[in-house]
C-alpha cells in the first residue's frame, strides 16, 4: 500500500484540509462517479461489494494501483498534483470514475 502513495507524491496532512471524499465500489460501479478535491487531499476508496476490486489510475501524473481490495476495506489515496484523473477497476473494466484535483 505504500507504493501507490509514493507514486502520487504524498503530502503530509495539514490542519486546514477537508475531510476525505469517499468513492464506494458498489454493484460493480463507483459511487459517486465524479469527485472534486484540492491538491493534497485524499479520496478514500471503499469496497462495499461482496467481492474484490482493483482500483487504479493510469494517468501519467498520478499513477497508482491499490492492488486487490477485499470486501469491506477502505484505502486512502492522496492526490498531489492538479488534473482530471480517470479511476478504473482492473477486474471490472467497465467501472470508471473521475477525480478532479484543483489548486
What are these regions (language model features)?
Residues 1-3:
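Bacterial N-terminal signal peptides that target proteins for export
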Residues 5-103:
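Extracytoplasmic copper-binding redox domains, predominantly the cupredoxin/blue-copper superfamily
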Amino acid at each position: 500500500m505504500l507504493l501507490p502513495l509514493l507514486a502520487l507524491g504524498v503530502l503530509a496532512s495539514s490542519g486546514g484540509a477537508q475531510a476525505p471524499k469517499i468513492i464506494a465500489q458498489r454493484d460493480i460501479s463507483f459511487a459517486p462517479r465524479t469527485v472534486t478535491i484540492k491538491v493534497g487531499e485524499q479520496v478514500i476508496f471503499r469496497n462495499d461489494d461482496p467481492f474484490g476490486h482493483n482500483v487504479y489510475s493510469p494517468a501519467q501524473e498520478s499513477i497508482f494501483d491499490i492492488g486487490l481490495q477485499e470486501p469491506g476495506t477502505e484505502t486512502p489515496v492522496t492526490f498531489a498534483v492538479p488534473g482530471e484523473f480517470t479511476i478504473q477497476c482492473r477486474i471490472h473494466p467497465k467501472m470508471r470514475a473521475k477525480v478532479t484535483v484543483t489548486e
